């Protein structure tokens, strides 16, 4: 079961946001929340909010436990770029690019391992081996 949450037009460059999301991939949701609380990167606070939103979506919409969730995907794509200008010497102007990005988190529930049923061949082999060892 996949649960998604997204953050659009986040006012931070994609490069800076990728630094944090790269480390989150594959982590359990609880571990990732603890890590995000301790990191001092600028985007970690907003990614923590996004992670909490994704966990709330999973609990509310699909009745999943937070302990079973892990981060399957963390995508950061570039968004629109706001173009501003700064006055410079001799009447010139230089461009300032204020970059944005879109972040998408995908959580999945880890399936608990179920006891496998032995096939007939496996059970017959086990019986034969036990008979041989007894005689």
In which residue ranges do the predicted regions lie?
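Structured, basic alpha/beta domains of bacterial-type, RNA-associated proteins
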Residues: 1-125, 132
């Amino acid at each position: 079961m996949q649960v998604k949450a997204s953050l659009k037009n986040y006012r931070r460059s994609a490069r800076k946001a990728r630094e944090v999301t790269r480390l989150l991939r594959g982590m359990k949701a609880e571990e990732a929340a603890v890590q995000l609380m301790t990191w001092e990167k600028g985007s970690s606070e907003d990614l923590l909010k996004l992670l909490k939103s994704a966990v709330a979506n999973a609990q509310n919409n699909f009745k999943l436990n937070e302990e079973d969730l892990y981060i399957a995907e963390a995508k950061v794509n570039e968004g629109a770029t706001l173009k501003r200008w700064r006055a410079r010497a001799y009447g010139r102007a230089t461009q300032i690019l204020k970059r944005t990005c879109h972040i998408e988190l995908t959580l999945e529930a880890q399936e608990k391992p179920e006891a496998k049923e032995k096939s007939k061949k496996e059970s017959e082999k086990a019986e034969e081996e036990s008979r041989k060892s007894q005689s």
